[in-house]
Amino acid sequence: MTLTSLRAAATCLLLAAGAAASLPAHAGKTLDGIKARGLVVCGVNTALAGFSVADTGGKWSGLDVDICRAVAAAVLGDGEKVKFVPLSTSQRFTALQSGEIDVLSRNTTFSLARDASMGLHQTAVTYYDGQGVLVLKKSGIKSMKQLKGQTVCLQSGTTTEKNLLDYSKTHNLAIKPAVFEKVEAATAAYFAGRCVGYTTDASGLASVRNKEAKDPSEHVVLPELISKEPLGPMVRRGDDEWFAIVKWVVYGLVEAEEYGVTQASVDRLKTSSTDPVVQRLLGTTEDMGKLLGLDRDWLARAVRTTGN
């Protein structure tokens, strides 16, 4: 899905709102539980720069964190009413399936197997990534094709290993994966010289290079991306109302960006905009929130909390 089609989907809902305005949603089990406890419980990465990182005071920040805060603002009226649960790769799906968390917002790739066989729903893409490889600049390696017969470190329990093996087979490279259960072990092995390269999503490679390398300039990401990795929040199957809420919070933030509704301008535009789409978006002329079991200001609060 392209950004254009994502925006088109969001616009479609907004423009069709009037036709369905007489069909308010019924709150689902997940939303009922959230309202009862007064918190959205959100599973995030233990530490991935740009996506979810806690500072020394325990304050979380990053794209995945902002999605959780936007959802909390929409459903509870306060973007701070979130409990962040840091999860490893092996823990993330079990935590969602068991009900330990309400939403998984943890740089997780959408795939057919995950959507069809794990009892989970993929909501909306928040970041389009692709798998790459990090190597030492002094190795002289400038292309994936130069990894023929070499060992590449990676973490288990992700789409990474299969992508690497598929690429290796297609291009007859005989790349040897060195698989580690924990990402820290995989990156440590790479920096210790046990592998010629380290592979994961390109966003993760940037984080590893900048955060863990003694001298980031000594490492380069090869130009090829060997996969498509659409990342976004996931929820449990069986609660369509909650699925719709998380999905349309994301779509609403995208729509807000397209129409110039920002954290700084949302309050002004809510009262002064003459654009009919913006008026619907912010609940000025139509109560779209009731279609999701929310109030009319749900999206205005989300934008006010995290921006678009």
Task: Show where each model-derived region lies.
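Bacterial N-terminal signal peptides that target proteins for export
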Residues: M1-L13
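Extracytoplasmic small-molecule ligand-binding "clamshell" domains
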Residues: A27-T30, K35-S105, L281, L292-T306
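Sec-exported extracytoplasmic/periplasmic mature domains
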Residues: K35-A36, A72-G77, Q97-I101, T109, ...
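Bilobed "Venus flytrap"/periplasmic-binding protein-like clamshell domains
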Residues: V41-G50, W60-V75, T109, D129-A185, ...
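Extended ligand-binding regions for polar small-molecule ligands
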Residues: D66-R69, A73-V75, K138-I141, K145, ...
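Acidic, polar ligand-binding/catalytic clefts
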Residues: R69, A73, G77, K81-Q146, ...
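Short helix-initiation/N-cap motifs at beta->coil->alpha
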Residues: V82-T94, P177-A192
